[in-house]
Amino acid sequence: MSNKKMLTVLLVSLLAIRLGAQDSIPSFVKDSLDVYTNRALQQWQLPGAAVCIIKNGRVVLMKGYGLKEMNGTDKVDENTLFMIGSNSKAFTATALAMLDNEKKLSLDDKVTKWIPEFKLDNTAAGEQAIIRDLLCHRLGFQTFQGDFTYWTSNLSRREVIEKMSHIKAMYPFRTNWGYTNAAFLTAGEIIPKVTGMQWEDFIKEKIFVPLGMNNTLALSKDYPAANNKCEPHTIYNGKLVKIPYCQIDNLAPAGSISSSVNDMSKWVMMQLNNGKLDGKQIIPSQAIAQTRRPHSILGDGGHIFNKGHFALYGLGWFLEEYSGRKIVSHTGGVNGFVTSVTLVPEENLGIIVFTNTDQNSFYEALKWEILDAYLGNPYRNYSQVYLGFASSQNNSEAKKDKALQDSVALHPATSLPLAAYTGHYFNNLYGDMNVVMENSELRMKFSHHPNMYAKLEALGGNRFYVSFSDPIFSKAVFPFKVENGKVTGVTVKVADFVEYNPYEFVKK
C-alpha cells in the first residue's frame, strides 16, 4: 500500500473514531436513566416528568415518565405540555435582542424612552434604568421582592409596572443582583411600543412559528383548554395534592409560557446552533450572543461537588462554569411545576427536564447527573443527596407546624376580643386587605387575590397561626401590633416560593 493510501486510511479511521466518540451515549443515559427517573418519581411524590437530551444536533433521548395527574391513568409523553415558568425569560430577552439587532431599539435605551410612566422609588434609578437593567435583574431589588403583590393577582400589566414605584429597593441601583419578575414584564411591554404587537403575538410569530413550536402556548389562560397537558401539584402537609392552574398573564414575559420537551428541543437545537435550525437562520447569531454576554455577578459559582469559578447572569440566562465548561441555563417555577433548560455550547449538549410538582429537586438533580455523564465526571446520585436535604428540612418544618397546631388546639386566649382584629388594613405596595369574621372563622381577604383567603387561628396574645386557602402561599405565624389596647397593624409573610419579604399592613 502506498504511503498516500495508508495516510488516507489512517485519516478516515481517526475521523470515524472521533465521530464515534462524539456520538457515544454515556452508560448512565443508555442503561440507568429510566430506572433512576422512575425511582425518583416515587421518592419525590412526583406524578410525572419529561426529559430530552440533545447532543451534536441530534435528539439522544426524548420521552415522558409517569402520569399527567396524580391518581390518573394518562401517561406523560414527549408532547405533553408543562408550564415552564421562568424559562420564558430567555424568549423575552431573545425577542428584545432581535429588535436590537434590527436597530428598532437599543438595549441601552432608557426604559422611559419606551414606557414614560416607568418609575422607581429611587427617582434617579428610574430615570437612568436601561433595557439591559430589566433583563439582568440589577434594579436594586431583592430576589422576588414585590411578587406577592403581583403573583396570581388581579392586577393588569400596567398596574404591575406602576406598583414597582412603591417598592423600597433593598440595594443601591446596579450594585446587587436581585431576581425581579416585574422587570421582565416591563421589558416585554416595550415590544408592543416598538412593533405594535403584543409580547405574546411577537414571540409566537417571530420565534414559535419559525421554529415549528406549534404545541407551545404563550399565555397561561390558554393552558386549561389544552388537550395533552399535565395538571399542577404541590406537597402540602407532607402529601401530594392537586392545585389550581396558575394564572400569571399579568407577568407573562417573565413566566407564562407552556411547552413540551418536543417543542423545546427545537428551541434548544437552535440555541446550540447559534440561531439556526434545519439550515435556516431563525434568530440572528448576534442576538443569541447578546443574551449570553455576562451582565450581573451572582457569586463564585460554588457547587456541592465541584468548586466553580464564576456565576453570572446574562439576559434571561444564568451563566456559570462547571467542570471547565461554560453552562448556559435557567430554571422555571410556577404553581405546580418546576423545570430546567441547560445548554453546554462547547459540548453541543442540551438538557431539558420538566416536572409537574413545584416541590421537588429532581428536575435539577437529573440535569447534573446527565451533565456529569457527558463530561466524564463520577456518578453522584444527586437525587439522593437532594432528598436528604429536603427530608431534613421537611421534618424540621413538620415539627414546627405540629407544635403550632398543638398550641391552637389548646384554644389560647388572645389579648383582645377577636372582633378587635377585624377591619380594613393597608400596605403601600400591596394595597388593601380586610380581616373579617366569616363562617365562624377569622379570615384575611386580599384585594388583589379575591379568590384566596387566609384563615387565622389564635396562638395566644396577638399571634395567629395562618393557613392560606391556596397551598402555594403555605402557612405562617402573623403577629398583630397592639398599642394602648388597640390593633394598629399586622405583619404578613407568605411562602418563600412566592416572596421572601414580609409586608407591614397598617390598620385604618
Predicted features by range, described:
Residues 181-182, 362:
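Short acidic alpha-helix initiation/capping motifs at coil-to-helix transition points
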Residues 28, 38, 43, 67-181, ...:
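Active-site-proximal loop and beta-strand segments within enzyme catalytic domains
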